[in-house]
Every structure is written in structure tokens, then in C-alpha cells.
């Protein structure tokens, strides 16, 4: 007699042929009627299962597919971030909002991985954010004069470079400082500047990361100094630019990838070569001063379709009010922004390498790792370290479930199977599951029975020997009991007592002499910082004076060249002047 699964999977046409050529006995009729009733029940159950799966597939199809973001990390940097994070947690200086691997890495790089200086910088950043309400500045602050400010100070983001970073452009030659300060105030402009940075971190950088499928937290800057009047620009630079630079350096460090200063004259290049010696080599390597022939340099890093036409690109944005008003970039794509707001993307370290990008993008979602810290030293990670085998099993089971759901949704959305084939497949899978469950249950039952028989056999075999020779059993039990090991515990207690006495002998507070030394060193550091600020201002003033002298020198050259081109010789000109 055929098996039950074979009876259920026989097509109707084959059954019709068997009726024509084979006489059916009574026993076979009973088995077939039972199999048909069982088949009807299985079809109903499979229909319910397929309907629920189809509904689920439709719900998932309405969502946007998650995207994998490649996250490359250096082993040494990761260790430094772990140490820095532990220090912040111990000092209660790590809010959940800033519990991010890349944020902490930027601050460490800004202080050259000096832990004490980085902790101090982090503490000052948190204090500054609390005093100025930066955490809610996107919702609270409304900059109504934005359009007027754009007229007198054209600036903004436009497109991305070839590596996916946002491109920030400023046209300093178009600045009118007098009208700009009439339209807005210095404090409001600085708050607008901070709000722009917060939007960059919450919208632009995540959108660029999703579009490029790699983590991005820095930008490329282009500053056009064509037509800059340094006489009118001096006061604005002292008040506005210096304060903006301080805000950026103290609270948003390491966000500049490369800066290109274009249309720079000879005077600016002369001053830059002088000032460059006083700056950090790492900072100067990011700044490139270019003249009028800048187009080839910009096209090496930015695609022509992403570069505005006035900078040598092909983008015009005429229907959107110009390139500086359109704010072109991935952050204007509604699908990408929906992923950003729902956090439906996943960071994948490069060393993982589970699947290809397209396959992993269909299977995983950030909702499983949303609020966990991207640095690998969180509480959840410590639990994984304590139970590595359990973590591997859970990861493999999650991957298997995700693969099954992804395949089922893909087959349901692309090419639906016929009803008979779907029923047959569902029946085979259900029967396989039932068979595997029964096999496991029987094996477990047999194993437990064997174990019970072994235990009972040992008890039966040992019982008469113990009854015949009770003295031997008592002696053996006495021999098996080990003597109490008190000596090691006593030694450990003595060691602990000595350690406690040593700690008690130490003073509870720092001596007054050391406190005075620390205060003196802090006062010296503050005075040095003040002197540095003064030297910065003096350098800026001398630089502006050098630029003025260079411009005057160029004007004198032009005037002397026009005088030399005159048709009258010098003695004739003197003769004309005397007459």
C-alpha cells in the first residue's frame, strides 16, 4: 500500500485512469475515503496558511526595502572608542542620543586620541548643547529671514561628490556685510548655523549614507572668493567667521573632508603660504587653494551633473530658483527620507561578509539593532560575550527565518503559483514537519527510557552488596568525603585584610600641595589659551594688511605699466609739465 503522502500528491487525472483499469477492493475504498477526508482538511489548513502569508507579504511589500550600509572600522580605533565609552559611562556623560561609535571617534580624532582631553571636550560639548537648547533647535527655532539672507550671503548644499559626501558651497564674493547685518542679527545667524549642522547630522549624512551604501559623516566644501573685498569683509570675519569656526571646531569636529578655495588671487595665496606654517599639518592637508583654473580639480572629485554651472559643471537647476536655492541631494528623495525617518537601514561591518549587498538588503532591517550602540561595548554585547554559543545559534535561526520570509514574500509578489502546486508544497512541508517532530519525540522517549533502565540497573546491582557488607559501604562513604579545605580561604582572607589596611592608610583626599599645583597649571593653560586667541587675532589683522599691501602693490604695477606704455618720452612729459 502506498504511503499517505504519496496518496495525497497523486493528480486527479491519474486517479481517473486508475478507476478505468483497476478494480478497487473494499479495504482500498476505505483508505481512499479516509485519505480524501484528510486531503480536504489539509487543503483547508493550507488555504488558511497561504492567505495569512499573502496578507503578510502585501504588508511588507508596501514598506521600503531596507538597505545595508557598509561600516569599515579600524581595530585600534575601535579599542580606543571602547575605552572612551567606558570612561563616559563611568562619569555619566553619555546620553542615549550621543551613544554612537562614529560620533565618539570624531571627538577622539579631534584630540589625537588623548583620553583626558577628549573627555573634557565631550563634557564642554554637552554643557554647550544644554545651555543653548541644541537638542530641540530644529523644532524650536524658525529662521524667517532665510530668503533675504540667501540674497546677501549665497551658501548651501548642492549635490554630492564622487564618494557620496554632500557638497557645501559658499560664494564669499557675493556677500554684502552691511545689508546682511540689517536683515538678521549675529546671534540669530549663529543659531541658524547650528540648526543647519543639526539637520546635516539628522538628514543629510544619513541620506547620503543610504544612497552611497557606506557610512558618511563629513562633507566637501567649496569656497569661491572671486570679487571679495577684504576691506569690507574684515569686521564680519572677526565677529562672525571666528565664532562660527569656534562652534564647529568645539562641537562638530572632524566633519570636513576637503576644502577647495577657488578664484584665489596672488595676495590670498601669499597670505595662505604664510599662515599655513602656524596650522596643524592635518588641517592644511585638507585645504586646497586654487586659482582660476580650478575646473579640472573639481571635476576629479565631483561629477559634472552634481556641480553647478557657475563652477564649471552641467547642473543649472533653473526651474528651482538656481542651484543655491534648490538644495539638491539625496535628502530630497522621498524614498530615502522615509528610510531615514523610519531608520530602516542596517550598518554592516566590512569584516562580517554574510551575504551580498542585494541579498542582505532584502533580509534584514535596522529595527532589530535600532537603539543599540554602534560601538561594540554595550550591555548587550557583554551578554553575547558571556554566551557566545547561544548568540551564534540565535543569529543563525534569525537568518533562517529571514531567508524563509524573504523567499515567500518574493514568490508571492512576483509570480503567484497555481493553487494545486501551492497546496502540494504546503502539504509536503507540513507532513515533513510532523514527521520530524514525531521522530524527535520518539528518539527523546527512547533515550529517557534507556537512561531510566540504566539507573535502575545500577541501583539493583548495588543494593545487595550494600546489604551484605554495610561496614564496607560506610567506610567507603567516609573515605570519599574530602576533608574541608580551610587553609586557602584563610590565606585569601589574610590577603584581603592586608589590602584593606593599605587602602585605609592612604589619605582620602588629595594633598593641598598637589591641589595648588593643579590649580596653577590650569591657570597657566587658561592664560596660554588667551594668548593664543590674541595671537590669532593679530595674525588675522596682519594677514588682512598683507592682502591690502599686495593689492596696492598690484595697483602700483598696473599704474606704472600704463605710464610706460605712453607715447611721450619722460623728458618730453617733463617739458610739457613745465610749459
Curated annotation (Swiss-Prot):
GO cellular component terms listed in the entry, alphabetical order: Golgi membrane; plasma membrane
Q: Where in the cell is it found?
A: Golgi apparatus membrane; Cell membrane
Q: Which SMART domains did the record assign?
A: CRAL_TRIO_N, SEC14
Entries under InterPro entries matching the protein: CRAL-TRIO_dom, CRAL-TRIO_dom_sf, CRAL/TRIO_N_dom, CRAL/TRIO_N_dom_sf, PI/PC_transfer
Query: Where does the CRAL-TRIO domain start and stop, copy by copy?
Result: 145-319
Q: Where is the composition biased (Basic and acidic residues)?
A: 379-394
GO BP term (any one): protein transport
Membrane topology reported for the UniProt record: Peripheral membrane protein
Q: Which residues form a coiled coil?
A: 512-539
User: What's the superkingdom here?
Assistant: Eukaryota
TM annotation in the entry: none
Disordered as annotated region, ranges: 372-419
Q: Which PROSITE patterns match?
A: CRAL_TRIO
Task: Please give the chief subcellular localization of this protein.
Answer: Golgi
Q: Which UniProt keywords apply?
A: Cell membrane, Coiled coil, Golgi apparatus, Membrane, Protein transport, Transport
Instruction: Give the family from UniProt.
Output: Belongs to the SFH family.
Free-text function comment from the UniProt entry: Required for transport of secretory proteins from the Golgi complex. Catalyzes the transfer of phosphatidylinositol and phosphatidylcholine between membranes in vitro.
Q: This chain belongs to which protein, by name?
A: Phosphatidylinositol/phosphatidylcholine transfer protein SFH9
Q: Which organism is it from?
A: Arabidopsis thaliana (Mouse-ear cress)
